[in-house]
């Protein structure tokens, strides 16, 4: 029976040695990660969601000329937010619109510009390695072809876009080895077109 305590002691010793060999982040890195984790603001995220909802509808086929209603207004506001965030970090973000004309599809029968907004934070050591955070801009009611009715889309997917904006605000204050792409995608409810267009670029 004396072998059992010895076996248990040996197992514990081996486990502690294995744990000691696992590399841990240096204290400075741990402090940065703690700061990042504590930085998101529920108030800012809610304000962004409410702003996106205020455009009435963000349907892919909706109004693009108005500055207060439709997907065009939402796109311009998101682009401006990315630019504002970039200005606060000394131009650390490349803000671009990526789009294409889609037509002849069941949910996009007529020629329609599907435009997504990207903010790219280039990596310092491995810029060809990408991490992408995205939310889709567009919203819809039950009838996927109804582009005039209000479709606030707070949970599908204004909160995803708001989370992406908040991530850009926080992470752009730091430098990372790889590249981070913050993306607000259009045309997702009509067939994931925004993501496809961005991936093709």
Give the label of every model feature segment.
Residues 108-115, 141, 146-201:
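Acidic/histidine-rich catalytic neighborhood of metal-dependent amide-processing enzymes
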Residues 28-35, 40, 44-47, 51, ...:
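Extracytoplasmic/secreted proteins, especially bacterial periplasmic and envelope-associated proteins
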Residues 57-60, 101-105, 124-126, 137-141, ...:
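Solvent-exposed loop/turn segments at secondary-structure junctions
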Residues 36, 47-122:
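A non-catalytic alpha/beta surface segment that caps or lines the substrate-entry region
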Residues 43-47, 89-93, 126-131, 176-181:
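Loop/turn elements at helix/coil->beta-strand transitions in domains of secreted/extracellular proteins
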Residues 18-21:
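Boundary at the C-terminal end of the N-terminal hydrophobic targeting segment
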Residues 5-16:
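Bacterial N-terminal signal peptides
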């Amino acid at each position: 029976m004396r072998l059992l305590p010895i076996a248990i002691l040996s197992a514990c010793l081996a486990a502690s040695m294995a744990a000691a060999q696992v590399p841990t982040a240096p204290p400075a890195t741990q402090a940065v990660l703690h700061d990042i984790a504590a930085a998101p603001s529920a108030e800012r995220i809610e304000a962004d969601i409410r702003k996106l909802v205020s455009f009435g509808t963000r349907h892919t086929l909706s109004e693009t000329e108005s500055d207060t209603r439709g997907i065009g207004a939402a796109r311009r506001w998101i682009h401006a937010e990315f630019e504002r965030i970039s200005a606060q970090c000394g131009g650390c973000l490349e803000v671009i619109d990526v789009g294409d004309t889609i037509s002849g599809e069941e949910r996009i029968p007529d020629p329609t510009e599907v435009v997504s907004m990207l903010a790219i934070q280039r990596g310092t050591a491995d810029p060809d390695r990408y991490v992408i955070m995205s939310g889709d801009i567009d919203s819809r009611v039950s009838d996927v072809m109804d582009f005039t009715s209000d479709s606030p889309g707070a949970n599908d997917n204004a909160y995803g876009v708001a989370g992406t904006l908040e991530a850009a605000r926080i992470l752009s204050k730091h430098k990372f080895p790889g590249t981070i792409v913050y993306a607000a995608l259009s045309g997702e409810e009509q067939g994931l077109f925004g993501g496809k267009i961005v991936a093709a670029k």
